[in-house]
Each structure stands twice: as structure tokens, then as C-alpha cells.
Amino acid sequence: MALGSRWRPPPQLPPLLLLLALVAGVRGLEFGGGPGQWARYARWAGAASTGELSFSLRTNATRALLLYLDDGGDCDFLELLLVDGRLRLRFTLSCAEPATLQLDTPVADDRWHMVLLTRDARRTALAVDGEARAAEVRSKRREMQVASDLFVGGIPPDVRLSALTLSTVKYEPPFRGLLANLKLGERPPALLGSQGLRGAAADPLCAPARNPCANGGLCTVLAPGEVGCDCSHTGFGGKFCSEGEHPMEGPAHLTLNSPVGSLLFSEGGAGRGGAGDVHQPTKGKEEFVATFKGNEFFCYDLSHNPIQSSTDEITLAFRTLQRNGLMLHTGKSADYVNLSLKSGAVWLVINLGSGAFEALVEPVNGKFNDNAWHDVRVTRNLRQHAGIGHAMVNKLHYLVTISVDGILTTTGYTQEDYTMLGSDDFFYIGGSPNTADLPGSPVSNNFMGCLKDVVYKNNDFKLELSRLAKEGDPKMKLQGDLSFRCEDVAALDPVTFESPEAFVALPRWSAKRTGSISLDFRTTEPNGLLLFSQGRRAGAGVGSHSSSQRADYFAMELLDGYLYLLLDMGSGGIKLRASSRKVNDGEWCHVDFQRDGRKGSISVNSRSTPFLATGESEVLDLESELYLGGLPEGGRVDLPLPPEVWTAALRAGYVGCVRDLFIDGRSRDLRGLAEAQGAVGVAPFCSRETLKQCASAPCRNGGICREGWNRFVCDCIGTGFLGRVCEREATVLSYDGSMYMKIMLPNAMHTEAEDVSLRFMSQRAYGLMMATTSRESADTLRLELDGGQMKLTVNLDCLRVGCAPSAAGKGPETLFAGHKLNDNEWHTVRVVRRGKSLQLSVDNVTVEGQMAGAHTRLEFHNIETGIMTERRFISVVPSNFIGHLSGLVFNGQPYMDQCKDGDITYCELNARFGLRAIVADPVTFKSRSSYLALATLQAYASMHLFFQFKTTAPDGLLLFNSGNGNDFIVIELVKGYIHYVFDLGNGPSLMKGNSDKPVNDNQWHNVVVSRDPGNVHTLKIDSRTVTQHSNGARNLDLKGELYIGGLSKNMFSNLPKLVASRDGFQGCLASVDLNGRLPDLIADALHRIGQVERGCDGPSTTCTEESCANQGVCLQQWDGFTCDCTMTSYGGPVCNDPGTTYIFGKGGALITYTWPPNDRPSTRMDRLAVGFSTHQRSAVLVRVDSASGLGDYLQLHIDQGTVGVIFNVGTDDITIDEPNAIVSDGKYHVVRFTRSGGNATLQVDSWPVNERYPAGNFDNERLAIARQRIPYRLGRVVDEWLLDKGRQLTIFNSQAAIKIGGRDQGRPFQGQVSGLYYNGLKVLALAAESDPNVRTEGHLRLVGEGPSVLLSAETTATTLLADMATTIMETTTTMATTTTRRGRSPTMRDSTTQNTDDLLVASAECPSDDEDLEECEPSTGGELILPIITEDSLDPPPVATRSPFVPPPPTFYPFLTGVGATQDTLPPPAARRPSSGGPCQAERDDSDCEEPVEASGFASGEVFDSSLPPTDDEDFYTTFPLVTDRTTLLSPRKPAPRPNLRTDGATGAPGVLLAPSAPAPNLPAGKMNHRDPLQPLLENPPLGPGVPTAFEPRRPPPLRPGVTSVPGFPRLPTANPTGPGERGPPGAVEVIRESSSTTGMVVGIVAAAALCILILLYAMYKYRNRDEGSYQVDQSRNYISNSAQSNGAVVKEKAPAAPKTPSKAKKNKDKEYYV
């Protein structure tokens, strides 16, 4: 509920007088309660939004209908009933769930009660006498629709049920009793009709003509024919306010029967009695009233006239809404009188020196803090009392009598021997400077309200204290802003803390030597921090533990339902349980804390507990604010919280209600403070909902629901989910034995209580899961797997902190729970520590323990998982973890998820996000004769072995260790099954794995071999387990070396008879775990025989459906394949490794890549791919800006939780978005965007591709065709003309910077970003490598390490230029005959180019599309080269030095397969038909077909067509010179498979990026799905002239790129910026028009091609008769191959001699053909 106004009675008049005032002058109606009774009033218009309805009632009925209205039978209604003698209100708006209010005040007592109903939009308040409550409905609409009249006491019979929204109201019993003064706002409503009403309505006794009340008295109809007069505000008395002055303000039915003017109720009272008879009063006198607001009081100085009395009397009247407060006090030490209001009751304490006499007076119903006047009289008189003792004689004692309102009286006797009240101090009225320090005071706060006519009288004199204060007597001292009239004092509204995160910050509490705090609280929750404040840790340094450097603190907390006080004044703390019973019972609990120096007391519900602080300090020095209800989020980390305050460390804020907070006797307006601070989760009022919150089963995904205070609490531990209702999937981290996550806390943490929970899954029996570590001590709390059990270790380094020897424990405490937890299933572990108590739970099986010693403080700087990196104080390092961890929550902090989302900046990790297959440290045994020898296996009493293997061989020895006598152990592969053979001295035994099929299937399999101390052997293959019990010998005594993978040949013959292996293992081994030790098989080997190498890439050499994951594109090569991962956000050989990942923290961060001024590219096409995860609904991910002044830009952003792109390349802003994919869910998403001119596509994950085609493309295509015919010398003129005409606004000009993170745009991104790729640039990878062009700023963290460079000198250029690869696996070569060029060696610089045709020069010499450039200049810093034809050995002419400008990043790389080309850019299929229709189309195994395929971008003997246009000018391809009009005659056909031929120009993709995995569609490699009819599937060729790829088109299905990925997801098309499907390819249409003018050229080209084929056939003949030589193809590194193999050429031992030209690279001989 929002903080809103609470109903209070109107000012000036107390409720009783208000009742009388409202009833006066208005007719009363008597309802008989008979059938058919009703009253109908005019419609209450104020009920629609804001308004008040009030009336008075008197009844003895327990159930009846009072009021009803509705909207005519639709949704809204308001109903006021009597239920069980109490008022119940129900209402609703807009068909929302009805709200219900049930008041506690009984009204069926046949007495008058005042009712006020207040409407305020969705909120309605109901008040009866002094009780008020409010409720609110959760409706869409704020206003209530009111269509009916106001029905009172019943429903007329003519109202149909269908016209009633709440039809049951018609069957409620009619009201029986009196109802008077019904008002809507300030006016009575018009009575439209009635039935069954009697008496009062017909006799207007209080009408002006008959009003009997004189002097302005208020007339009230009490009963038929009977009236009463309220004279309280007139100054007169009597039945009709006509007799002199009345002594006090009060209702007409009060009796004056005291000789000193004390007033007593003879009947009734507000909320308790009816209107009784008015007795004849004595002569009135002037009243002396004062208002106290908590900080005011006055005192009379008795030092000059001390009191010595034996008989005395105190009288006063009070009116308040406050439950606690000091009204009067005199005396000190052991001689005093104290009169207070405590919990709404009057409390009297008298001590005459021998002990205190206490009396408590409570009303029968309600409380005295009802804002009505109450009169108190205290007397002490001498009485004779029969004593009981030795003498059994009568003694004189003093009788003490206290009466409140004349009828509530308590009597008692003071202690004997002390009869005189002596006081020479002060007479305090309404409060004191320090109420908590007054002797005998049951309260610690001053009075708030009105006090009137305070008089003290004894035998000798009379002190009219109120009069003396008003008249300014010199002996009277006034404190504060006293007002000598009765004013309304706002009640201290309670507040509700609705969540553990809610808190209110109070001003700093200055309580150095003395102080007091009192409050009431109410909750049902067992734990919570109520109050907390602390001082500065004076002189504290790192690692300081001296007691002199302790910080002072004060706290109150609830633990397990008990209230605890915690106090430390710098010399030692105390922790005191203040309540003897649990106080979380949902009832109000009053707490009163008082301190004076080291001494003090805390009282809980009047049960006081004294305390004495330890040490010598008496000063409590608090520097921080005083926090109520909890701590701020930042304060939990930044403040060095005292470890003794357990709820602070556990982040357990208080949930419940708090009221009446007084600090040092002064009130604190909690509601006002909460409103001023905008406190989240702090609501006004306090109500306890009776409905069970868990009844609706709100917890999802198996979460356990428990009831809280007006809330439910979901326990998500063990579910794999987090969040309020377990709705958010917890982050999973995968560990391979070398990975970790480390939380490096900003400050050293000291705790005495911890709650830790996590889930794990592992196949290893050993491994560290979580540990706290300290840089300065051996303190640790560690969870690890130990022999398949969960082991908890808690070590508290007592010696390190200098604690007393008696406090030291016996050493680390350990607990074990669970068994066989290494079953590759999810398990849940939880640790709960409270001081010395330990609790370890695994899968709901709990083990408890108790720590020895008094020292309980745990110090830590780090929380580590996977690997324990802080090892200075540990003797035995736990084994590294291999497996998966999830849902790590440490003291309320979900660190894994916070680390992933960037919520914390002190996280370091290289573990991989997501549930990934784990293969740790794989090694490959290349031959059966290869093996390793390690140190002896230690397996004497027990053993736990684990490893993974992958092979195609059916047999082989995996592990062998011999021992003393006949002891040995063997693990081997026999006919595809695992055998475990062992001998412990009882003879050899064999166990065979029961896998359902042979395991030599080239898949990874997991093997677990264990033996427990009970001699139970276990063999587990994947998920299938075999066990065997052995008798006899229990120990395995091994010696000698442990052999892995095989043995020497002469040793096989000596193996025991049950061992079948006669050869070694050939395949891969990984994740080898030897009893908790993870050896590095190669580094730790004592001997390594044969070919044993790191890594395991498998034997596959052909692109298959599973070759590349995450939509990576398989690129077939001569002896293998590589995966192009550029548009996946992943890396690695098969696109399954995380791309370079950065986590952007809360404060925002920015990564900026800036092109050098001379190398700024201008592009007509752009490719962007990025992976990310976030919970933000609005942020900017990536932005690319052009140079200053141009205004071109491209921006990828998140808006309302969805991804969108906006770009501008010179025209208007163009937007494209994906509204269906919500990406703000914290999961990993991959976005792919492509742009070609104004066309754009956007794809999120596997959602369908969104495409956008701005109008006007057709004109642009035609102009592009025409542009190619213009000679170079006129090209600039035409470009300027086109620019003037607005035709060339499709180019992203002069790109200057790429900015990642959105910090500069005011919409910073928070989360992780992986594998970003933009036009050949991998900016995140460059940032990780500290590239000089990259700048980082803000809260940024690199996950793991940056990508390593695995490229040789020969393959660096090849891999970096994988972006230029076409990605289909069918390829032919088109040979150009119009240009002669000569190549240079692949130096990653610009190639030298010479053109002989102006037409071609115009299109090819200047590839830049930047129309702002004045001339075409060669670039000296470019990293890409132009592929050329090596045709002659002549040096290039001087003109060749003017090579085209080539921007460093490629701006042309196709998105996956066909996505890089539009219809504008592609040659029609007819242009490719001659190449694809030759004799080598169907079968490509023949060498004659393979020989000509020598296409590359690196001048290594490849043939290219120089007539192709610049890279980013896609329009040029429409005039490809080999095009014929046969395109339109082709019928769709399936492309011929060529599995062993790689794609042109691509030798590999940079498979070294790291990024989290994400599911992706699974499509067959090499198969294309064409979206549009006759659409060619051709990638953009490399920069400069290249070789187009011929591929047969298919009509029916939509275009699908040839991608490979993991299965299980829909096969959806990827982005492809092509024209709309209903339009024919414009390029083909335009080319047909040109064909008649190029017939001669085509004939020449065909003739030249035939000549080339003859020459090549001859060359192949020579090639096949060469000396073959011998060579071995290493299949373990297919992603790094030499360029000759990459281009389909056959590797020769001896290349034919050729002229030495710059185009020759080492080990890569060029084969040159001359045409």
C-alpha cells in the first residue's frame, strides 16, 4: 500500500464530542429490523472518487445490513455490514478482487458509536470511535462507478437482483437500532423513501424551534422523545447548558463528585458507554490546558519548598492518541511518584523508600489513548491494616487508590515503616529532560497530547501546576513550544516493512553516556535486523584485530523469534537475549532500552533484563545513521559490519510493523521519514492479513513456500532457480579443472553466521566447490567432494587474531554428508553456521556439529569456486573441480548470477557460462605403441578413478599398475567394452562394464572406477553401474610406474591371464582423475613413448551436419574442414568455445575502437553479430559512427526488452527490430544484422529473419548498372552528379569509431557481451589484446583470458581473411582473359595491380565507396590484399604503385552463406552455368576436376577474374561479362555434392574466440534453402577481383544458409538482405538486356576457356606421373592448414622450377599456368 493519509477525527473536538456534535440537530431514525424494512437516500456522488460519509448508531444486533450502493449490477459495489457485532466493509472497483475491512471495536453494546467512512480513489477507510483502518483494491480504474441510490438498513423489494452487483446483499438481515446524523460530507442526504422506520424520524426534537440546549449547547436525540445537551465547549453546565461555568471540557454525561474537581464517568465513555444522565455539577471554574508534542514539558522547582507529606492527592485529565508517555513524576532515588501511560493503560508507581508499589489501570474495552478526555485521581490515606507476623497486631499503613473516569479503581498498600513522601527535586509534568533515567519510570518517552488541570494537594498546601505554568510562576520552568490550549497531536502512525530490503534511516544517535530507545513491533517472521548503528573503526588497518581498534556499535535483532540486544562501546561487546519467550507471535511487543554508562536494562513487554557492558569504556560513539528495519544495499558491503550482528551479515532485514519509536524520549515520525526518504517497501499503517499467502501456491519450479508477515517466502534452494517466486533460472558455470570463479570482496569480511547454498553435478569423486579464503589468515569455510562425499571444513585461525588460548579450538572442524555424489546428477548442498553451531545438508539429509572453543569469527577476503588460488595458509590444496556449479548463494548474495549480469565488479572468472560438455586436458595417443608413465597410483585402502575417452579402436590398454606380490590394477578396452581387472591378493578378478553398446563409437564416454574401504568395487560407464563385493584382502599394494595408454611390447606378454590387451590404446583421453589428483599427463609423465600429443580433434575430415556448432559454417578443405564462426559470437575449431567476453558493470562501461584517420572505411554493406545476456530493458549495445560532420551511423540497441537497429547512411533514419524476441531475460542471445545499401536484415537467435526494403531500390540498381559503363576518367564527374541527385545515399561514409556499451549515449548496457564481429573486426578480441586502436573505460571486466594467437607465419593471413570466404561447398572456377597481373608474396599489404581496360579500371581500381574522397590513394597500412593472376614474370610497371585504397577490416564478408549478397550484387545463374555444367559437375573425385580449383586471396597460384568490381559495390555484378540469357531457362535442381572440396578463398576461420554457448538451429552442411525463385547463392567475393561461386538455384523452399549447429532447435533461415520475394532478381533482368552487345566477348571467352582446359589436362597428366613421395596428413589441426592444401591443390614434394618472383612464399610453391 502506498504511503497515504490516515483518517483522523476532525480537529478541535475529541471523538465523543464529535459524535455529539454530528448527532445534534439531526433527526434520528429507529429501525425496527422487521422484514421489508429499508431507507433510500439520494445517490452518494462522493463515493466515485473522494468523499466522506458519517453517522451515529446504537444497536444490539450482531448481524445486519447498514449501507449499500453499487454501479447497477456491473462490477463496483460498497457494502457495510454488522458481523459478529463489529463493522465489516467490502468494496471493489473495476471487477477487481474485493477488499475487506473488519474492525475490532464492538458496536452491538446498545451504546452510541460514531462511524466515518472515507473514499479516496482505490482506497477506502473506515473508522469507529478511535479505531481506523483502510484498504485498497488493485484495480485498473481509480474511480468507483455509482449508479444506485444509497440504501440504509435494507434493500427495497422493488430492486431486482439483476440490478444488484452483489446479489447476496438482498438477503442480509435488516438493521435494528438507532441511526442518527447521517451525512454525506457536511450535508445530510435527501431521504427518498423508507419502510418500517418508527419514532425518531417523526419528532424533530432538536429542530431550531424546539432545541432545549442553551448557550450554544449541542442537542442530541438520545432516544425517542429524549434529548441531551453537550455543554463542554460553552463554559456552562446543567442538563441544558444553563447553569454557570463547567469546570472542564467533557461530555454531557460526566459526573463531578470529587471535592477537588476530579471528574468521574458514571456510565459510558467514548467507545465504552452510552449517553447517560447528566448530574448536577458543582460550580465550574476556569480550565488550564496545555498541549504536549513529545519534546515539551514543564517542571516545578521544589528545592525551596520540599514536599514532606503523609497524605496527598493528585488529579488531572488527559487526552491522547499515543500509547506511551510520562504524565507526571516527582521525587528521585527511592522516594518518588510516577504516573504514566503505558500501552494505552494508566500506570502508577509509588516508592516511599522500601520498595515500589505499582498499579495498572486498563479499560474494559479499548484503550485510554482514544483521543477522548479521561480523568485520573490518585490518593494516599492512612489506614489500619492487620499484619501477619510474630506479633499479629494491627499496623498503620497507607492505602493508595487510583481511579480513572470514576469507575476504574485499584487499591493497594505501601510498604510498612515508610510513610512519608519526601521530594526536594522537581515536579515534572508531561515529560522530563531524560524520562528513561527517572527512577521507577515504566516508559522512556514524554507525553504527547493534552493535559488539563494538573493539581497536587497534601496536608499543607495545594499546587495547581497547570495554572502556575500558564501564569508563568517563577518557580515553574517551561521546556519546548508549549501551547496552553488543547490541540490535536498527530498520532505516530505505524509503518510496515514489507520486504527485507526495506529500511528507514534515522538521524545519528548521540548517546555517548546515556540514552534510551523505545518502540513497539509486531511480526511473525523469526529473523530480522530491527535497529543498527555503528561508529568508525578508529585506526583500523588491514588485518588489524586489536581490541582497541574495534568499532562501537548498537543493534537489536530478531533471531529464531527471540529479541537480542548487541552493544559494544569499544572495549568488548555483549550479546544479550532480551526476551524469555519468542516474540514473533504477530502481537504487539513493547521494547524499552535504557543505558547509563556501562549499565542499563532492556525491557520486553514489561519484563526487564539488566546488563553490564564489558571492558572499561563508558562512551558509546556512533558515527553512522541509525537504521531501522535493515541496512542499505551499499552499506552491506562498504561498511565493516560487526560479525556479532548475525542478521546484518545474513542480509536478513526486518519484515513487520513498527510504531511509537522514541529516541531519548523524543518521538520519531516514521511515516514522515519514510515519505521524505522515498523508502521503498515501507508502507503506512499496520494490518495483519488473515488469508494464508501460500494457499495460492505462488512458488514456481518446485520452490517451497512458507508464510511471512503479510507475504510468502519462497525457498528456491535445490530448484535451480532464483527470484522472488523461483522464476529465474540460475546461472550454471562449467569447470574443466583449470577454471574458477573468484569473488574478491572490497573489504575483509568478518562473520559469525553464514548461510551457503549451491547445486553441483560432477563425475569426479574429488573437487573443490566453494571456499572462503583470507589473505592474512588460515580462516576458511570450504566445501569439497572427498571420495564421493560432501566435506565441510571450517577453520578459524584463533592464533592469528591473538585470541585467548581458552578460545582456541582443537583445529579445523569437518563434517561429512552424502555418499556417491559423483554420479553426474544435480545435488544440493547447504551450510548453516550460527556461532559455534554447524549444519551441513546434502539433498535434505542434514548433519550437525558443534565447534570447540569460544572463537567463532571467520575472516575472508575471497569466495572461490573450482580452484583454491589463495594457498599461503593451507597445507593440503584441495583438488580442482570438474563439473558444473549453479545457484551459489552466500549470505543472500547470488554471486554467480551477479557476476554474469555485471552487478558486481569484484568478480574474476574463466569458467564457462552454461551447461557445457566438459573435456579437460585431452591428449591423443596417435598409435597403439604410444604410452605414458606416471608415478605409482596411491590406492592402498580406497580408490576413486575417473577419466574420459574417445576412440574408434575396439581394443587397447588404458591403465596398468603392478604391485607387490600379485597385486595389480588394469583398465582396458576389449571388443568395444571396458574391463576392470584387479588383484588385491586373493587372485585376479574382472569386472565388465555393462554399457548397452560398444563404446568405440568415436564419442566421449565417462569411466568411474572406485573401491571403498568396505572393499566394494564399482565400475561405471556413463550412467550404467556395476558393483562387486570382495572378501579377503582389502588393500591394494601397488608399486612401480602407472602406465597410461599402453605398455612396451615386451610387457604385454607378462600381463595376468585375465588381461586381454596385447596392444596399446589409440584415441583420446581426458579429465584423468587419480584419487583426487588431476595430473598433467604430458607434463607430469616420467616417460612419454611414441606420439602422444595434447588435444583431440577427432578423425573427421568431411563437413557433416554436426561439424560446426551454433550456426557456424563448415568450410570443406582438402584434408579436412574448418568452421567459419564469425557470425555466431563463438569461436574455437568448431564454433563451440566462448567468444571473447566482457562483463559491463552497473556503473556503465565503454569499449571504443577508432580507425586511423587515413584508414576509415566507407561501406555499402555491413555485417554485425554479437552475443549478450542482460536483464536490462533499455540500453545501447553497439554504435558505429562516421567521421565528424557526416552524420552516418548504425546503432544496435535494446528497447522495451527487444532488439532493434537504427541506421542512417545519408537519407533518413531506417529502423528494423524484432518485437517477438524478449532479450531482457538474462539468457544468452545472439543478434545478427546485415545491411546492403538501404536494405537490412535482423535475426535474433533462431527467430525468423526480419527484412526491410526501403522504396527506391530499383532506380538505384539501374543507376549502378549504368555507372559501370562510364570510363574511369569520367567516374568522378558522374559520382558528383549522382550525389547531387541523391542517388548515391546508400554508403556508410568514412566510419570512424565502433563503441560498445552505450555509456556515451546515456543508456549504458549492463551484462555480458561476447564475440562481437563487425565487418571483419573482432573488437572485443582486440580489446583483450590491448590493441592500440581500442580504448576501454568504466566498470568493465574481461571473462577469462583473451584469445591466444595460434597461427603460423604461413597461415596468419589465411585465418584472418576467413571473412572473405564463400561458405558453400560447391565451387567452380571462372577464368578471366582480359587482364594480366602479377602477384606478390602474401605480406598482408596491398597487392600491385595493373589494368588494361578503362572500363575495368573504373570499377576495380578504387574499391572505396567514400564519395567524400578527392582521389583514390593507395593505403600503406591495410591488412588485406587483392587476389591476382600470376601470368608473367615481368616486374610491375610504375603505375602499379597506385594500388587501390583498401580499408583494414573487410566490409564485405557474407553473413553465413548467401546472406551477404543482394539481388543487385549477384550475377544471374546463367553466368555461372557454363562453369557448373561441365563434365566435372556430378563427380568431383577425378583429379581433372580438382586441378583447376586454385582460388585464394593470397597470390599462391590461384586464378581470379579481374573484371569483378570492388568489394562493397554490389551493383557492379549485374554486368558480369560472362552472363547469358540462359538463366531464365534453368529449372531448379539439387546441387551436386562435393564433400571433399573446400570453398573458394577460405582456408579457415579464426576459431579462437571465446563466448558462451547458445542453442542454434541444426541445418545440414552444404545444403541451401533458397528463399526466392532463381536467386543465386553467391557470397560476396574477396576484396578486389575474385572468383564467383557457381551454384545451381532451387525454386521451392525459402533460402536457407548452409550452416551446422547442435540439433534440437527449429530450422529457421538466417539473415539474408535480398530483395522482396515477389520481385524477380533485377540483376538478371538488366543483364539480359546487355547480352546482345556482349556476344562476341562471350565467344572469345568460351574459346579461351576451352584452351585453358586443354592446357590444364596436360598439366594434370604430368602431375599424375610425378614421383609421389610420402607424406602424412595431420588431422589434429584441421583449422590450421597450409594455403596450398586449403585451395584444393595437391601438395608436392618437389615443385617445378619457376622464376623467382615476389609472389612465392616459403613452403608454398605457386603453380602457374599461362593462357
From Swiss-Prot:
Keyword Glycosyltransferase: no
GO term, biological process aspect, one: presynaptic modulation of chemical synaptic transmission
Residues bound to Ca(2+) 2: 779, 796, 857
Key words of the record: Calcium, Cell adhesion, Cell membrane, Cell projection, Disulfide bond, EGF-like domain, Glycoprotein, Heparan sulfate, Membrane, Metal-binding, Proteoglycan, Repeat, Signal, Synapse, Transmembrane, Transmembrane helix
InterPro entries hit by this protein: ConA-like_dom_sf (IPR013320), EGF-like_dom (IPR000742), Laminin_G (IPR001791), Neurexin-like (IPR003585), Neurexin-related_CASP (IPR050372)
UniProt binding sites for Ca(2+) 3: 1192, 1209, 1291, 1293
Residues in the Extracellular compartment per record: 30-1639
Keyword Transmembrane helix carried by entry: yes
Entry comment on modification after translation: O-glycosylated; contains heparan sulfate. Heparan sulfate attachment is required for synapse development by mediating interactions with neuroligins.
Transmembrane segments: 1640-1660
CDD domains: EGF_CA, LamG
Domain (Laminin G-like): residue spans on this chain: 30-206, 289-486, 493-686, 732-907, 921-1096, 1140-1348
Region (Disordered): 1461-1511, 1529-1549, 1583-1626, 1682-1715
Cytoplasmic side: 1661-1715
PANTHER family from the UniProt entry: AXOTACTIN (PTHR15036:SF49), PIKACHURIN-LIKE PROTEIN (PTHR15036)
Family classification: Belongs to the neurexin family.
Designated name of the protein: Neurexin-2
Organism: Rattus norvegicus
